[in-house]
Each structure stands twice: as structure tokens, then as C-alpha cells.
Amino acid sequence: MQVKNILGHRNQFMVIDDDGAVHFQSYDTHMAEITEIVGSEMLQLRMLSNYWSVTTAKHFKVWLEENRLWLAVAELIDHKVFKNLKDFMERVDIMQVSRFKVYVEFTDKDGNSNNYKLSLVGEE
């Protein structure tokens, strides 16, 4: 297991476990994990806590960038699925990203479960 502070902040961690899953922890809260879906080239982000703060969001964005998922989140924001990173962090349950597609399960503003599929630029 590897533990790394993000941006040198002593309470924002990226943890890589022995199975290859990458976790984001803010203080004592396990916020999210990224795993590779076996048998595919797809990454899955699972939000374990839908907490948001300015400090946590800043470090969460860096964590997403380091794990090649920020561009998928930015596309969802550009397509108005989410207003901003805060909205994403507060409402997402699962996001799956492949080379050309993003699939996200989230809670809408009325508390209902919803999903959205997005084809990324460059799809053949």
C-alpha cells in the first residue's frame, strides 16, 4: 500500500492499495475510489461520501487529474449535467469512463436516481 499527500496537505491523501485501487481520503473521510473494471479498459469512480468543501474540492480535482479522470468530469460539466465540481461531488454515485464514453449515475435535485451517457469527442 502506498500513501501520498496531495499538494503537500497533511490531511488530503491518495492511497493506492495492493489490488491497484486508488482512493481519495480527506481527513478521516474515505471520499472516493477508482478501480479498473476487470476485462475492460474502463475505469470506475465510486463516490463513497458526497461531501464538499473548497479545500477538499481543490485536492479532489488534483486527484482526478493524476488519475486521468478530470477531463471526463469537465466534459460532464461542459454538457451541463453538473454545474461545477461542487455539484459533481455532492451528487455523483458512480462514474465509468472508457476511451470514448462516460456513464454516470447520480442523484438529481429532487433526490431521484438518474443516469447519463456521454460520447466523447473522437469516437469512431
Where are these regions (language model features)?
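Terminal leader/tail segments of proteins
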Residues: 1-124
